[in-house]
Amino acid sequence: MKETYYLNKDTLPVMPVPHDNIISNITVDDEFVTFILETDPKDKDDSIQYYKPGAKGLIIRYHTERDYLIYQHRKTRRPRILCKLFRPRIHYVDVDENKLEALARDKYSLDYIEHFVGYNTVIVNLYAKSSIYLRMQADYVEYEWLF
């Protein structure tokens, strides 16, 4: 079952926000950034099951023109003696956009935490050993519920 939400209309859509789901795959092509989310059968509070009971997974496709930015939360490493004197420096760094697909294949599981929607803009919050923000220009979003 497919649902389409347009982000370039006069009013923003009311769309479900899946949260705390594991991303099994990410694909990037010329038009779409696609996240494939899977349900956790052990989790009684699964957000995909909450929005569509009986769904096994969800495919989210953001229609974009490869115009996106990726930021990852990092902490600088300092020698132990300096850490006692100074707090570690925490900041966000740019991640190469070609590494977006590799994030799902990392040894740490990649979680889809939430997303924020604005006019023609989406900010996706991911998590894999640290916070990752994906900011992109998108004119519509497709949800495909897998049963």
How should each PLM-predicted stretch be described?
Residues M1-F147:
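Surface-exposed, interaction-prone regions used to assemble/regulate multi-protein complexes
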